[in-house]
């Protein structure tokens, strides 16, 4: 809209563009205050034509936006100003229902910390399971699980696994060295809690993916 209205690229916040071989980054864009202002592309019919085609389709939804953490080597918290905002549950449920009706193979939630809202995210998992039983879809659900995942978060993964929906359960540690974690402004769960999570996941046949970053400040010289 800005370009069509004749606005110069320099005056459009929140973009990066190439100007005569030099990359230009404009200032930060104003954050959307009310997520209800954003229409769902699924619910307004932008992707309805997909159901006419014999494609294997994945879909991405977002149930909340933002991250309360400010880990140095993660762009999520810094770019979203840390405050988490939630999409209306009716919208989220509508998108999950759309995914089921339209035979979406894998539903991906692009949240930064799925499971951080215990009761709300439990309701969302209920809806995903209910939708699969109703339509046979989605086949799988994937997301970025809450940092410092606890047993409550693992409970969500176990329910998904029991209904054949879980692809993997991811735990991000970045590093286990205390000095490195201090350098990158990050804290992890206690190692005993981490072991308990792994043991219980194994007991429930859940594949666990552990995310680390190699060569963080203070780790290698």
Model-inferred region functions:
Residues 42-204, 214-216:
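Radical SAM [4Fe-4S] cluster-binding motif and immediate context
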Residues 1-34:
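Glycine-rich beta-alpha loop elements in corrinoid/cobalamin-binding modules
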Residues 29-48:
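A short, charged helix-loop
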Residues 219:
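Catalytic palm subdomain of template-directed nucleic-acid polymerases
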Residues 23-26, 38, 181-184:
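Short clusters of hydrophobic/aromatic residues that line enzyme substrate/ligand-binding pockets
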């Amino acid at each position: 809209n800005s370009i069509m209205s004749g606005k110069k690229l320099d005056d459009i916040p929140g973009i990066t563009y190439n100007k005569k071989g030099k990359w230009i980054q404009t200032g930060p864009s104003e954050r959307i205050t009310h997520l209800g202002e954003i229409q769902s592309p699924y619910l307004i019919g932008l992707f309805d034509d997909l159901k006419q085609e014999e494609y294997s389709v994945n879909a991405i939804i977002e149930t909340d936006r933002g991250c309360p953490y400010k880990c140095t080597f993660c762009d999520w918290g810094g770019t979203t100003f840390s405050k988490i905002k939630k999409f209306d549950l009716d919208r989220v449920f509508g998108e999950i229902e759309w995914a089921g009706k339209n035979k979406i193979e894998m539903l991906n939630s692009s949240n930064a910390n799925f499971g951080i809202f215990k009761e709300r995210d439990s309701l969302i998992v209920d809806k995903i399971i209910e939708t699969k039983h109703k339509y046979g879809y989605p086949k799988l659900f994937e997301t970025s699980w809450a940092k410092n995942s606890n047993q409550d978060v693992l409970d969500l993964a176990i329910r998904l696994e029991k209904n054949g929906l879980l692809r993997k359960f991811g735990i991000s540690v970045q590093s286990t060295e205390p000095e490195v974690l201090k350098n990158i402004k990050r804290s992890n769960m206690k190692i005993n809690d981490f072991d308990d999570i792994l043991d219980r996941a194994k007991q429930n046949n859940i594949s666990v993916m552990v995310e680390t970053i190699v060569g963080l400040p203070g780790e290698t010289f």
